[in-house]
């Protein structure tokens, strides 16, 4: 490529925000050129390995927040509701994850944040899972948390905590009004302070600008998230963003490539909405990303695991772990 981007970045010459935005918006630069540069970086740090992740929706539909993308929002009248599931169901999910060569098992709860009782419930269950499946990484996604809860999660064996920034600081109030951008950043910082690996990502396709997308990538670089899930909006009828169009597959690929160029050494995961937004180009996204969710998401379906395994094999890649 005319800019030798990969060589520059691997030599610690980081992109500036202005330069990244210019690259992202320059229509004379082919998306596949950017992907080729991203692939050189991805291969340098991760080879041809692909990390697999699986979600369990452990508590659904009980939420006070008004997130405009979410089918579990307080504003949604028709939604699946259930309280925190029993430990046996969470443990059964861990068994399925292990049998399917999943490296990270994500336990997700709806709501603004967990009660202390819910945290204790999760901690006891995670402890038991770690005894049975010591090699399985556990990611918790429970909402806004405090120091005491983070300490308990760490002691129980939680390896990673997911709390997405979701969008840029500028656009945040268009997405949700019941908590602040600073609330989200604070939760990530609490996890880092308690030596739990921070996982934080975005949702693209909610009406944000190109500048917002680049701002998101730099914000995640600034908070030093170890893992960055990139979701693409899967519009849900009845939500604020339910009437928006899907992003084009090529726009999605360009976004993923830019996130790799801006966060070169981080785990970048293709997450929710990949099937309906990337469509037939899902495999190409792994030229920049090195991680995917397999199976279903929280309230939307994924594709069969066998298709993901075949996609990885067809690329000449291999499952990490």
Swiss-Prot record:
Pathways per UniProt: Cofactor biosynthesis; biotin biosynthesis; biotin from 7,8-diaminononanoate: step 2/2
GO MF assignments: 2 iron, 2 sulfur cluster binding; 4 iron, 4 sulfur cluster binding; biotin synthase activity; iron ion binding
Residues reported to bind [2Fe-2S] cluster: 106, 139, 199, 269
Protein name: Biotin synthase
Biological-process GO terms, alphabetical: biotin biosynthetic process
CDD domains assigned to the protein according to its UniProt record, in alphabetical order: Radical_SAM
Function according to Swiss-Prot or TrEMBL: Catalyzes the conversion of dethiobiotin (DTB) to biotin by the insertion of a sulfur atom into dethiobiotin via a radical-based mechanism.
Organism field: Staphylococcus haemolyticus (strain JCSC1435)
Reactions catalysed according to its record: (4R,5S)-dethiobiotin + (sulfur carrier)-SH + 2 reduced [2Fe-2S]-[ferredoxin] + 2 S-adenosyl-L-methionine = (sulfur carrier)-H + biotin + 2 5'-deoxyadenosine + 2 L-methionine + 2 oxidized [2Fe-2S]-[ferredoxin]
Stored Pfam families: BATS, Radical_SAM
SMART domains found in the cross-reference section: BATS, Elp3
Domain of life of the source: Bacteria
Needed cofactors: [4Fe-4S] cluster; [2Fe-2S] cluster
Assigned protein family: Belongs to the radical SAM superfamily. Biotin synthase family.
Keywords: 2Fe-2S, 4Fe-4S, Biotin biosynthesis, Iron, Iron-sulfur, Metal-binding, S-adenosyl-L-methionine, Transferase
UniProt keyword Nucleotide-binding present: no
Assembly notes: Homodimer.
Cofactor note: Binds 1 [4Fe-4S] cluster. The cluster is coordinated with 3 cysteines and an exchangeable S-adenosyl-L-methionine.
Span of domain Radical SAM core: 45-271
Catalytic activity, EC: 2.8.1.6
Chloroplast as UniProt keyword: no
Binding of [4Fe-4S] cluster, residues: 63, 67, 70
Gene name of the encoded protein: bioB
